[in-house]
Curated annotation (Swiss-Prot):
Residues 92-105 have a biased composition (Polar residues). This is U-scoloptoxin(05)-Ssd1a. It comes from Scolopendra dehaani. It is found in: Secreted. Expressed by the venom gland. Residues 1-24 form the signal peptide. Residues 79-105 are annotated as: Disordered. The keyword Secreted applies. Contains 4 disulfide bonds.
Length: 105
C-alpha cells in the first residue's frame, strides 16, 4: 500500500513538472507604442513572440477613424469577446484567440 501511495505521488509530481515546462502562447505584438495602435501594425509582417507565463490569449484591436486605420496586437490574460462596432465614421474590431500567432490576420 505504501508503495502505491509513493508511486501515485511520484506520478503527480512528474505530471506537474512536465506541465510547468509547456511553452507560453506566442502572439503577434505590435502597435503597443501608440495610444490607439499604429498603422504599420495593420499590414506589417511580424513574427509571433512568446507572451508572459499567465497570458492565455492573443488579442487584436483595429480602429478606423475614417481617414486612417491603426491596429494593436498583443497578449492577454483574459478572453476578449469578438466585437465590431461603428459610430459614424469610426469603426472598431476587437477579438482574441488562443493558438500561437492567431492574431496575425
Amino acid at each position: 500500500m505504501k508503495e502505491a501511495v509513493k508511486m501515485s505521488c511520484l506520478c503527480i509530481f512528474v505530471f506537474l513538472f512536465l506541465f510547468s515546462l509547456t511553452d507560453a502562447i506566442k502572439c503577434i505584438k505590435c502597435g503597443e507604442s501608440g495610444l490607439f495602435g499604429t498603422e504599420d501594425c495593420v499590414t506589417g509582417t511580424f513574427e509571433a513572440e512568446e507572451c508572459g507565463p499567465n497570458d492565455q490569449y492573443c488579442t487584436k484591436i483595429i480602429l478606423n477613424d475614417g481617414t486612417r486605420t491603426t491596429a494593436q496586437r498583443g497578449c492577454s490574460v483574459g478572453h476578449v469577446p469578438e466585437s465590431n462596432q461603428k459610430d459614424g465614421k469610426v469603426s472598431t474590431h476587437m477579438s482574441s484567440c488562443n493558438t500561437d500567432g492567431c492574431n496575425a490576420n
